[in-house]
Amino acid sequence: DFMKAEAYLALGNTTDAANHYEAGMTKSIAKVQSFGSRDGSADNTFAPDAADVAAWIASKVGEFNSAAATSGLDAVGYPTAKDKMDLLGEQYFIAMYGGAGDAFNFIRRTGYPRTLARSLATPTESGSFPRTILYPSGEVATNPNILQRLDLNTKVFWDTGVTNPAN
């Protein structure tokens, strides 16, 4: 649903984007809540009830609907206000917890969310964002059809080079 929301945003259809944004959060939370039923001794004391979940999702959808399509950046490269893609990216990253590949490709594809944490030591010099990952040495040694990448900045064929201001 988050990918559909992204596609609808690209098409300028914010209504369908918001609907899929909401559906993505709803499904993600339902999946996490289902984990408690797998453990009979789980302490669900702090688990939110359906009303709390619905209210939280409604607040996020309201924030999404009132956000601008785009926003500017401050002197360090953070957004002056979160725009729709920042909000979508944040929730997509939360839903992808444990599935980093999709989140990594999302930021390479879109440059969002622009709210990612930077280096604490030098926030204005966090280095370049990795565009690829090196092949495992065993793969390079046994597969004569591939060459090891020279660095982490070599783009894959579909990488359009969108950069995140954080990097």
Task: Name each model-derived stretch.
Residues D1-N167:
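Acidic/polar-rich alpha-helix caps and helix-coil junctions
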